[in-house]
């Protein structure tokens, strides 16, 4: 399913070749072209893209649950985005805006700030953007949340054609093209407005090639509009052949003409869809073979965005799900069987925002990097690092030569493109300056990451007027009526809540519900030790992870851990596990040597719900027996083309299996989940979506003839 997908991704981005003129404007030496107009770039942006897409008149009609999606083919210095964001703020519509942009040669945050410095009216917006802007050396999708979730920016660093293909592949522009019969979730939302932008067609023809517009058409609908500054004949023909109807009008300033218009029909609309695969699928198949569609659902044309939701589970996964849904205008009932939030693995005093980082190129390492970057942005943008923890940095120690090579490569790659990189390689002799104590090896320091108190975070996430918390409420059964409403019931059939959708966030206990009983998860016991700080350890001002982990002391106590105990289920604190944690700390730093009386040492025991492939399980819940019957052909041959959508429970989702990385994984995974629920274009790559998908285990077991 995924090995061939790996070749679609580049290991690093292509740096922009640019110079700056006396006015501080960037100029591309590679394309011999300006990034924006040298006369009045902002006025041109408003004239071409904002006015010709009629944004100010369209936005007031949005409902509070609608998302308006803008897609741009060249981010450049971000001027178009800031102008759109400013107009959105001044219009103050009820819904949300999702701005998607592609950039093959991304500028770094310092270059973005310098380029935008010319417009003081954007100073506040530019500062927010640059504070959350991803490392320019990291390829792929990067999702940024602004204005408390009302504005979302998804950047794709890499070739626009590849990025557009990812969106098409993930969202089901496959078969039945003319009526969009397959999608992620119950209903698909497509692009509302296109900004076709980039260096001029004569100097950068790749961004204006016909397949760009054909891919754009596959993500468009009858109300989709477009605008572009150019009227070149090759662009006109490509736009028209892709199914867009164009108008030619006088351009801005000295530019003679420009194009704008609407989408009419897909060029394959009059062709048998089963014999006419889309551009993305033809390109994919040429490189990688068969593209499966088991992750897609048959679209429900009558589906409306959910107004109510049940979230089962009050740990990190449930709190994040409730928070994200509430921000989208959903009234959430959160059911927790315990008397308070965060009772399971989410109950530690301190937890690090941690994933295992590398540039090895495998799917998990790419997800880890994306999750780490998004989690840190999320906790900063919502101020959770201030209210529930501290972004004092995390040092990842090089515990082997192989790990040192990986971590050093990350630091060097980021240092080569960013003047103030998020990731910094620190030599062993310099670690004391970085974290406060000298460590046994060098490591990778993530300056904007840190630790959080999971209990406080769960309370902060669920502190929203649209979230109702019901404790001592054990949802043992789920039932759906003929109208699609979900009911959460106790063992004896007592109704706890009803809603349009349900999200299961109960870690391994999801196996106790009939709909998710087959999910492959196991519990791994972990014990954390609470250690009294001493003279040397009090110098620690950042978190350190290696053989174990430790965070700076709070109220004189360090939280350190954690043991991994397979096939054990005791909740009792054990002296041997305390000693295990203490020994690991001593191996990391002589300053982190502790000798407490083990018999009285305090700590915490929890159980991590892990999956066989280490990815969490996030997305719509498949109907197991129907899935196996529909895709039975995979038992004979994994590459069998079965152009059918998968069978899924309408309105039932799951978010479990985060293991020990809940703080790092849940923000991005939950954002992807909500995009699925609302049919929004995904903020993650197709590869990542398939690795998170709950049906992936059924697909794999069928191809291996295990079920």
From Swiss-Prot:
Its EC number is 2.1.1.61, 1.5.-.-. Keywords: Cytoplasm, FAD, Flavoprotein, Methyltransferase, Multifunctional enzyme, Oxidoreductase, S-adenosyl-L-methionine, Transferase, tRNA processing. This is tRNA 5-methylaminomethyl-2-thiouridine biosynthesis bifunctional protein MnmC. Its cofactor is FAD. It comes from the Bacteria. InterPro entries: FAD-dep_OxRdtase, FAD/NAD-bd_sf, MnmC-like_methylTransf, SAM-dependent_MTases_sf, tRNA_MAMT_biosynth_bifunc_MnmC, tRNA_MNMC2, tRNA_S-uridine_synth_MnmC_C. The keyword Oxidoreductase applies. NCBIfam families: MnmC_Cterm, PRK01747.1-2, tRNA_MNMC2. GO terms for molecular function: flavin adenine dinucleotide binding; oxidoreductase activity, acting on the CH-NH group of donors; tRNA (5-methylaminomethyl-2-thiouridylate)(34)-methyltransferase activity. In the N-terminal section; belongs to the methyltransferase superfamily. tRNA (mnm(5)s(2)U34)-methyltransferase family. In the C-terminal section; belongs to the DAO family. It catalyses: 5-aminomethyl-2-thiouridine(34) in tRNA + S-adenosyl-L-methionine = 5-methylaminomethyl-2-thiouridine(34) in tRNA + S-adenosyl-L-homocysteine + H(+). Residues 312-707 are annotated as: FAD-dependent cmnm(5)s(2)U34 oxidoreductase. Residues 1-264 are annotated as: tRNA (mnm(5)s(2)U34)-methyltransferase. GO terms for cellular component: cytoplasm. One of its GO terms (biological process) is methylation. The lineage of its organism: Bacteria, Pseudomonadati, Pseudomonadota, Gammaproteobacteria, Cellvibrionales. It is found in: Cytoplasm. Catalyzes the last two steps in the biosynthesis of 5-methylaminomethyl-2-thiouridine (mnm(5)s(2)U) at the wobble position (U34) in tRNA. Catalyzes the FAD-dependent demodification of cmnm(5)s(2)U34 to nm(5)s(2)U34, followed by the transfer of a methyl group from S-adenosyl-L-methionine to nm(5)s(2)U34, to form mnm(5)s(2)U34. HAMAP family: MnmC.
